[in-house]
Amino acid sequence: MKELMVVSKVTTNGVGSGGIIIGAATSAASEASVTPPQDLRERVKDYGQDDVFALWDELSLEERDFLIRDIRSLDLARIDRIIRCSFRSQGVPTPEIEPVPETSVSKVEERTMDERARWWKMGLKAISEGRLAVLLLSGGQGTRLGSSDPKGCFSIGLPSGKSLFQLQAERILRIQRLAAQSNDDTFVPIHWYIMTSPFTDDATCKFFESHGYFGLDADQVTFFQQGTLPCVSKDGRFIMETPNKLARAPDGNGGVYSALKSSKLLEDMAKRGVRYIDCYGVDNALVRVADPTFLGYFIDKGVASAAKVVRKAYPQEKVGVFVRRGRGGPLAVLEYSEMDPSMTLEINQTTGRLRYCWSNVCLHMFTLDFLNQVAHGLEKDSIYHLAEKKIPSVHGHTMGWKLEQFIFDAFTYSPSTALFEVLREEEFAPVKNANGSTYDTPDSARLLVLRLHSRWVVAAGGFLTHSVPLYATGVEVSPLVSYTGENLEAICRGRTFHAPCEITY
């Protein structure tokens, strides 16, 4: 199901395929009567969903109006296809899983300085020519962090107090400057597409507006919403959250593909001359947004898709890993919950590493042509993951299914995928759980940032003092000053910084 997409600077009137009826000429108020509208009753009955009107007689006129609008907003044919295809896919034997071929991975220890410099230069050139767009997955709330705000609004407690959104925006600003310097000071803005959800869209837009888009031009940022889908029972029937309202849930971060398609943003990218898309999740405090090295590697390899990966920290780590599905088949991500415990312990006798060691950390690069292919392919196949959850319903919380697609579902459609190994301590500081949890907290992410930046400062000839143990603190380098530790010698050499502090111009 696709709801009407609301896009900052871009609006759409059509949603997905199948002809959703939204904003019908006849208002729901004039339709509400003793019985539900005849055409609507017939539509829901055709798809076996007539239970949505089971409590009609108990509803007020206003509640009936709301229910009619809620049902009319659905593309019932599309949703029925999704439910049938997703249920049918359960229990279907999957291709045999094989490890990722070593030749598919660019490993840190095998890369030369010359290669890195060449990829960096290639990436900056493409950026300076306007060929890269950045795509941010930001539909989640910070509930697990103890906040009702969008996760990107969250501050992990750095000396600057900057939010995740601000850190990422300033990295874009820095790369724009570096790209312009590499191309005779010709400035081309990087367009930033930010996917929100119905639960975070308004707050996200207001946060950017109130902070002046963190120095970016407002017209280089586009917000768009992912869709939602009805939650369903074990027999595929819609669950009613209240007598007059469907229980719905976001369609997963993989909903980005259909959202880009239905909001016509793939066409928008093409008009802007974009050829490559850097895609990432909001909850990584060390994400290198618009990384020229990764982009240059991607262009050099000539593949349709690529992903940054880190090696599993230990066999039982709860992360999805890249695998090959079937002999000679495509690369795909296998969730840790899908792995047999014995698989997690298997060792590659040649390398001495785990056979299944390449963790997916949601740092991806795609060509625009491939994004178009994925958007059409996923829509055609209509297979969603079924997540069993407790769903709020008129009968209290009941077990049911949420229907989701994941960002990594794209890889099974890719004719060619390359994996690019990065170091956790340099590029992966996840912010998922509240402080006090055992891992992926704001505190752990903050320490990863401060330790990395402290190493940059020392490497540039600076000195650090501190009033608490250095392992618990450090210095923060503003992204406006340095992207990966460059440009710091003139600022740091011979100077002493008292941690914690932020280094700016």
Regions found by a protein language model. Name each.
Residues 14-22:
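Intrinsically disordered, low-complexity regions enriched in glycine and serine
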Residues 22, 27-219, 230-233, 239-258, ...:
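N-terminal glycine-rich phosphate-binding loop and ensuing alpha1 helix
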Residues 134-136, 194, 223, 279, ...:
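Structural beta-sheet core signal
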Residues 137-141, 150, 158-159, 197-200, ...:
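An acidic- and aromatic-residue-enriched active-site/binding cleft used to recognize and process polar
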Residues 191-192, 220, 304, 416:
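Residues at the starts of beta-strands that form the adenosine-phosphate
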Residues 212-214, 218-317:
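Conserved beta-loop-beta/alpha segment of the NTase-like Rossmann-fold superfamily
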Residues 269, 273-278, 286-290, 295-475:
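Catalytic core of tubulin tyrosine ligase-like
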